[in-house]
Amino acid sequence: MDQVEKPTRLPWWAWIRLPVFLAIAGAMMYPAARDFRRQAEHDVFAPSSSLVGIRRLSEYHSGLLMTPCNTEVYIFRGNEPGGKVLVLGGTHPNEPAGYVAAVVLMENLKIRKGTVFVVVPSNASGFSATEPQEAYPETYRIPLPGGGYRQFRMGSRFTNVLDGWPDPDVYLHYPSRQILSGNETRNLNRAFPGRPDGSRTEQVAYAITQLVLRERIDLVIDLHEASPEYPVVNALVFHERAQDLAALATLTMSTEGIDISLEPSPQNFHGLSHRELGDATPTFAVLMETACVVVGRLRGRTDADLVLLGNDPYYHAAARRGYVRVPYPENGIPMEVRVGRHMSGITALIDAMGQLYPEKGLEISGIPQFKDVVEKGVGAYLHLISVRPREKRQE
């Protein structure tokens, strides 16, 4: 009879290899997992004393409830009724001055008459990741005059792919049936007016459209940035209903030394906030663009300094050859110039609406203007934050 071989007895150290391997793998993965989780955390704000409530977009479209796109709607109201304004910041999360300008507005706004709604970040999902192959920094810090800093996220132009996967081969805009490339399905400024059963990005656009309708918003201001070589830059884009209002605002800005062009909203290019909100609602819909090298195609190294300073050697070379559409000074186009333009633009638009339509007038104060921001810096109008302020519900 063949003798049965006894199984070889493993040495003691063999029994602990798997637990040790798993422990080492877990320790290596923990920092990445921690950073991944942190990407879902929003920046912290300190709204002014004129804040009366904070809602969420899900209150205008329940489909966004319990999703990363369910961002806050900050409501500032005076003691007297008046016009209603909606400011969108962070529609494109890779355009930092549009986002920061909305934060500066909500942290400094004083209002006696009327109501101002601020949706920031408009595309919250887009701030949970940066854009592939763009080498954007994850964050940038704005120094405060008394010491310390405020840190803000840099995001992607598009909704996070995790909230919109997979992209179709072709994006068919609703309801125009305009055809765009597939990844534009995650571009919030190609999704208006949105639809309740569409993609996550279309649902965000739908919620904003419903906000405009339900709250009877008189004026929508969408804050953006564009590359210096882009044709529509340092511009105020307006729906035709807002033509007189936009023209008066640009005249006011010109008296402050701000060179800004007027651009009519194209009627055959759909999905844009100014086009679709103007068509789908009675509001005056406008969009402002400032020049930002971070979103340009000609830039070099893209780091936090470039976000803040806007000073790039390749753009200086391009400017000398006439390849850019705006003046590009020796010190670049820093954050304070870009944010300052937006702040003066917001004030000019609100004032223009009150002059042309007195029943829609607002009485506001506290908003820093272009010269103030350029002279003192953006940090002078941001608060040092140590804890997250408690949310207040609308009364």
Where are the regions a protein language model picked out?
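A short, Lys/Arg-enriched amphipathic alpha-helix followed by its capping loop at the start of a domain
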Residues: 101-114
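Second-shell loop/turn segments in exported
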Residues: 88-92, 192-198, 332-335
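Active-site neighborhood of phospho(di)ester-bond hydrolases with catalytic His/Asp-centered motifs
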Residues: 87-89, 119-121, 222, 261-263
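C-terminal accessory segments enriched in acidic
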Residues: 2-60, 66-74, 133, 200-207, ...
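Di-metal (Zn2+ and/or Mg2+/Mn2+) metal-binding site signature of metallo-dependent hydrolases
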Residues: 92-100
